[in-house]
Amino acid sequence: MTEGVTIRQIEQELGRLRHAAAAPGSAPNLRTSVMTHLAWVPERWVDAATDTLAGMGERHPSRTILLLPRPDDPRDALDGEVDLRCFVRAGEQGQVCSEVISLGLCGPRAKAPGSVAMPLLIPDLPVFLRWRGEPWFGDPALDQLTEIADRLVLDSDEWGECDATMTQLPQLFDRVAISDIAWAKVQPWREACAALWPDIGEADSLRVAGPRGETLLLWGWLRARLRRELELEHEPAGEVELVAIDGEDVPAPRAKRTSSSDLLSDQLEIFGRDRIYEEAVSSLAAVPA
């Protein structure tokens, strides 16, 4: 990554790569984008974000802008790197290429990502923001990026303080449409619980062995749907292994292994607000302390 770059230099490098990709004598490369994909990636999440990005290009070609906050860097600077990532589509000549822009936001720049990202957005295409880790509530970075994004994609399984973060999340609902990857992961269990209707309507307790984020979302969903209090018992686990209602195990749905790339790609196909998700999270905010 080159240190001390400007947005103008990033734009010039994009142009150079496009020109090089169209070199005479070779099969033409099609540069295509269906969106701008912003990703806010604190240092601890860089490897996971890179792995996820590697599997997304063919399904959702986009201009990806990786925003790498470095608030403790003593410099007031922007570091940058531009790359074209190309792949072959079956039955087509040449390659389809997407642009990946990596930007290190050093020192004060970590507080002003909106002014960095805005000039690089593709006009008239939707903007999806993948925020890695816990949202920085009250921080200018979150405020600026949700202002320019059409959809905010989170994963509550990434949150260390999951309970507290859930109670703050409703403040974003009227500002930006939200997806939660943990909500998608727990969908088969929600469907399995719904199949127990009408008996589940009298439920008093829920027991879940699984990640805290998915557990809270399942609990909040049941509270919101049944409009009643439920006692929660949680056992930590890497994935949801067991759900029990009033001591009776819910039949486990068929296991489906989905990559992190596919989980994120699924969220990039959703545009409207998910009111059922919002109600589930809002019910958690109403839980007495």
Predicted segments — roles?
Residues 98-193:
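Internal, hydrophobic cores of structured domains that mediate oligomerization or house catalytic pockets
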Residues 87-89, 173-184, 200, 256-257, ...:
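Extended, compositionally simple fibrous regions characteristic of intermediate-filament-like scaffolds
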Residues 63-73, 130-132, 154-159, 177-181, ...:
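A generic structural motif
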Residues 178-230:
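ATP/pyrophosphate-binding catalytic subdomain of soluble kinases
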Residues 1-32, 180-196, 270-289:
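Short N-terminal or domain-adjacent regulatory/targeting segments
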Residues 16, 24-25, 35, 52-53, ...:
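C-terminal structured domains
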Residues 1-125:
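An N-terminal, globular interaction/scaffold subdomain
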Residues 55-66, 121-128, 146-153, 223-235:
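Structural alpha-beta junctions
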